[in-house]
A protein has these predicted regions:
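A short, N-terminal "cap"/entry segment at the start of jelly-roll beta-barrel domains
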Residues: 1-41, 125-133
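Structural motif
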Residues: 43, 73-75, 82, 98, ...
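Conserved GNAT-family N-acetyltransferase fold
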Residues: 47, 67, 91
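Glycine- and acidic-residue-biased ligand/ion/polar-headgroup-sensing regions
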Residues: 62-74, 79
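Short acidic-glycine-tyrosine-enriched beta hairpin
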Residues: 80-95
């Protein structure tokens, strides 16, 4: 099908399109590493979770989270109950809902979506992208 719209210029393209591998990386400690991208009211965190790792149960006050399992598998613990999840599964966590995970032997890649932004991750992002003095 023929396109009638003009092609976006490089500057326009760069404002709208990002590649995960070129997004800034932050260290999440035992949770792995993450590439972060932010919209005005949401945050995308592409997380590489190491094999056989454990993400301690935690909560995000006033923040909703969606977690999409892109690759691998894990057993998520939500409010004290175990939820085995696999590639293609999506978890939804309400504000202040406790969650953690036991990652499988092959590790996992997940996409966490936060709304609003997590200030702690924004701070790590700022440190990771700021020039050292």
């Amino acid at each position: 099908m023929k396109r009638k719209e003009p092609l976006a210029g490089k500057e326009e393209f760069d404002k709208k399109v990002a590649h995960i591998d070129r997004a800034p990386t932050i260290d999440l400690g035992s949770h792995g590493t993450a590439h972060l991208l932010c919209g005005e009211k949401f945050m995308l965190s592409f997380v590489d979770m190491p094999a056989n790792s454990y993400a301690e149960p935690h909560r995000h006050k006033d923040i909703e989270q969606g977690t999409i399992i892109l690759k691998g598998d894990a057993d998520f613990v939500v409010e004290g109950k175990l939820y085995p999840v696999h590639e293609g599964d999506v978890l939804i966590f309400g504000p202040n809902e406790e969650h953690g995970a036991y990652v499988g032997p092959n590790g996992a890649k997940v996409l966490d979506v936060f709304s609003p932004h997590r200030e702690d991750l924004l701070e790590k992002l700022h440190k990771a992208t700021s020039p050292t003095e």
